[in-house]
């Protein structure tokens, strides 16, 4: 059911380079071949440089082009990002590099709001927390007291210029889209797969 010319599985929520590596190892063992059958492998197993960064960075570059149509850029903008996995981490990194201030990250339990911004050092902590220790985003607020954790909520009520849903499908609904618009959001850049509901798109 899988193969370079059939179906090429990729990582997703809870499935990163480690898990893809496990599956690729078994594929090699069963098929006795080393082909491009799974994407998201580590570099030691034939993975591509910048593969982990590609989606998050690409979301920012796409947003940059959208902003340019209005004569705007990331510089000085406030960004709300959902998620705290691969896509969200690198979207946060690139948005910060482009001059924005990222103020939210989330997971399935809730979101953190850091009015001072999630800079490179704080993001390094998030990457260690999520990628190595498999922790929860609420631990960010325990480490950085200026941040607030909102249990069971999504970050779309936070005032921002740019919203980047980078968590999961249907995470931004029509009411939340209207809230973003009312709060002055000028750009929504989707990093996740189908994160906006049809009602949100129409808003």
Predicted feature descriptions by range:
Residues 39-42, 47-53, 57-154:
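Glycine-rich phosphate/diphosphate-binding loop of Rossmann-like nucleotide-binding domains
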Residues 29, 64-69, 149, 169, ...:
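Conserved helix-loop functional segments at active or binding sites
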Residues 143, 147-151, 156-160, 174-180:
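A glycine- and small/hydrophobic-rich beta-loop-beta segment
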Residues 18-22, 86-95, 177-178, 202:
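Short glycine/threonine-rich loop-to-helix capping motif typified by GTGT followed
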Residues 1-49:
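N-terminal ligand-binding/catalytic initiation module
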């Amino acid at each position: 059911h899988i193969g370079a010319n059939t179906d090429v599985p990729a990582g997703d929520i809870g499935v990163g380079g480690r898990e893809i590596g496990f599956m690729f190892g078994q594929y090699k063992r069963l098929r006795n071949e080393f082909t491009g059958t799974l994407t998201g492998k580590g570099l030691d197993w034939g993975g591509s440089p910048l593969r982990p960064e590609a989606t998050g960075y690409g979301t920012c570059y796409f947003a940059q082009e959208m902003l340019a149509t209005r004569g705007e850029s990331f510089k000085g903008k406030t960004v709300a990002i959902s998620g705290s996995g691969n896509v969200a981490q690198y979207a946060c990194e690139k948005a910060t590099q482009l001059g924005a201030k990222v103020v939210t990250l989330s997971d399935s339990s809730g979101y953190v709001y850091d009015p001072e911004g999630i800079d490179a050092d704080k993001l390094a902590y998030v990457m260690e927390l999520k990628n190595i220790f498999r922790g929860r985003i609420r631990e960010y607020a325990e480490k950085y007291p200026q941040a607030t954790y909102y249990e069971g909520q999504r970050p779309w009520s936070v005032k921002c210029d740019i919203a980047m849903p980078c968590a999961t499908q249907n995470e931004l609904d029509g009411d939340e889209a209207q809230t973003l618009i009312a709060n002055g959001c000028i750009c929504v850049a989707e990093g996740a797969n189908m994160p906006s509901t049809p009602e949100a798109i129409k808003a």
